[in-house]
């Protein structure tokens, strides 16, 4: 019996070793680590198990000789093992799909953030470009403003320079005028002391012949012939004729001297006319304070006084000239005819009784004094100096012409009839229609109440004037264009 026990143990151990499944079968599907107790527990009591269930447990390691117990999956059939593997793969696939969906949502969120960032970046770039363009435009405007400021400054500087130069020229001309007047006063005082004779009723020639006097020709051959050779006035006249003042190309002639004295002694305000006189005549440097100048003035005054002391025939002719010179002409005529002559005093009322000037406002009188009546000479536009050799008579001849003044032009313009219509029809039409436009617009926009009229009296009148504007303008222009009767000028013999 003792001998049979070891044999039975060996057979049981050998059978147990043969029936144990190999390790390769268990690891063929790689599911040994993924076994579950629930799946394996259902097959414990089944008869299909390849190996019988153990009836006892080994308590010692030496009982199984160091071999590990098998896993529960090794007791499943291959079909069951495939089903378990498919379940595990489905679960893993589901987890992978969930992860993929999560990642897709994250990618979508990132894309939306990226699109927002791109939009913000584009908007910022647009703002930056707009700011750059605005900065460039501002710089251009600043440059243009700087250029405008520079041009304005340059213009102001040029104007200031011109004004300063103008004031300097005015001061220079005033100084020249003062020196000229002073020299003339000195010459007159010297002449009064030398001659001791009384002055004429109008004073010196500079006072008797005003700036507004007309063309006057004084010829005195009889007086010059009756004078003695030793007369100081005749001698001074001869000295003046022989001096350098007789040459018209180099120095000032007698006519220029008398004309300058008459222009400067007329009592006019010192303004722009002084500047024009000085710039046109240039009397300052051409009038030296010398004995020749004094003799010339003495000779001229003596000639004028001698011509006033004789009875002469005066012929007046009407010519075109300024309207406000009649009074001055009358004074000049009275001063020359009845200034110092007691015999001619009876004829002065006769001169006053007749009209001193023409009725035509644009005409003046040419006075000719002499033994023989000569034809009236035309008025020139400026001073006409005459040489002694060109005049057949030995007497003096003076011509003074005053240019048109602004005050006289304004007076003539005031006398003209005023017209309330312009030259263009469109301007008058707009002037009549435009004030009625707001009323018409208000009438069109506002809601008209019941019983309220749709017209406005002013707009209605303007509409009527607009319709008849052409005829109104024609009638007014025709009434203004009617010529006013004006008497024609003629000649009179005194």
Curated annotation (Swiss-Prot):
Topology with respect to the bilayer: Single-pass membrane protein
One Gene Ontology cellular component annotation held by this UniProt entry: cytoplasmic microtubule
Major localization class: membrane
Annotated InterPro entries: Syntaphilin/Syntabulin
Pfam families (UniProt xref): Syntaphilin
Domain of life: Eukaryota
Chain residue ranges for the region called Disordered: 1-75, 191-246, 338-398
Tissue: Brain specific. Found in synapses.
UniProt keyword list: Coiled coil, Membrane, Phosphoprotein, Synapse, Synaptosome, Transmembrane, Transmembrane helix
Sequence positions bearing Phosphoserine: 200, 204, 219
Keyword 4Fe-4S: no
Biased composition (Low complexity): 7-49, 230-246
UniProt keyword Transmembrane helix present: yes
UniProt name for this protein: Syntaphilin
Gene that produces this protein: SNPH
